[in-house]
Amino acid sequence: MIGPISQINISGGLSEKETSSLISNEELKNIITQLETDISDGSWFHKNYSRMDVEVMPALVIQANNKYPEMNLNLVTSPLDLSIEIKNVIENGVRSSRFIINMGEGGIHFSVIDYKHINGKTSLILFEPANFNSMGPAMLAIRTKTAIERYQLPDCHFSMVEMDIQRSSSECGIFSLALAKKLYIERDSLLKIHEDNIKGILSDGENPLPHDKLDPYLPVTFYKHTQGKKRLNEYLNTNPQGVGTVVNKKNETIVNRFDNNKSIVDGKELSVSVHKKRIAEYKTLLKV
């Protein structure tokens, strides 16, 4: 069985054996089989996987840190705990880190924060995979902002940005995990957004940066799992150089990739990519 999230210690590195022991191998196999069936029969869009992701996320974060030891990915189960976690990374001299943050108080929503320490200044940017018009993202953003302001971290600059790439109801956790990895892999491309955050150019600190203002800052690889074709086209209209960019080992462009993962749901073209990503992530936890 999967242990309660509050009982799983995700700080520090665990071995592959310890990671796998957080969840029954047999149960995990059954979950993966059901996820694959949901994609095959087309029921994936109308199912809610959020509670399952909340339970599995600690193991996924450990696995991510095992794969990328310098990513410094942290799972924060409530905004109330965020400031002390940030204080710890600053005091430990960590220059760059990521935080997957959960709503807490029984909530299911996730976002991801990218942290960078530049010339004695702290830059924190919350990346929301959906948009702030929905209750979950809005509440998590407010709680996060309040927690950071209450602690009064020295020379700390905080902004919230919306990616608006999520259309289904329960994929915020997998989106946040995928974005956390991209924030690490593409870290050299993100220097400008952090510099603009510190300068106060990125946002006024009160209102989130809308997706059309965010798009020029991010490489096309951040949009691999974009669920809506219209949203993907919006990004490519702003970043035409991304149209021909190869985004994976299959030599696919972002448009090729969308077409190869698209499904028609309620008359709309939607990508099933992030649901396949969940399966791939869950499979990394299986014992050989």
Swiss-Prot record:
InterPro entries: YopJ-like. It catalyses: L-threonyl-[protein] + acetyl-CoA = O-acetyl-L-threonyl-[protein] + CoA; L-seryl-[protein] + acetyl-CoA = O-acetyl-L-seryl-[protein] + CoA. GO terms for cellular component: extracellular region. It is an enzyme of class 2 (transferase). The keyword Acyltransferase applies. The keyword Acyltransferase applies. Its EC number is 2.3.1.-. CoA binds at H109, R167, S168, Q227, G228, K229, K230, D266, G267, K268, E269, L270. It comes from the Bacteria. One of its GO terms (molecular function) is acyltransferase activity. Its main location: secreted. Keywords: Acyltransferase, Plasmid, Secreted, Transferase, Virulence. 1D-myo-inositol hexakisphosphate activates protein-acetyltransferase activity via an allosteric mechanism: 1D-myo-inositol hexakisphosphate-binding induces a conformational rearrangement that stimulates the interaction with acetyl-CoA. 1D-myo-inositol hexakisphosphate binds at K182, L183, Y184, I185, K224, H225, R257. It is found in: Secreted. Belongs to the acetyltransferase YopJ family. Serine/threonine-protein acetyltransferase translocated into infected cells, which inhibits the host immune response and induces cell death by mediating acetylation of target proteins. Inhibits the MAPK and NF-kappa-B signaling pathways by acetylating protein-kinases such as MAP2K1, MAP2K6, MAP3K7/TAK1 and I-kappa-B kinase (CHUK/IKKA and IKBKB) on serine and threonine residues critical for their activation by phosphorylation, thereby preventing protein-kinase activation. This is Serine/threonine-protein acetyltransferase YopJ.
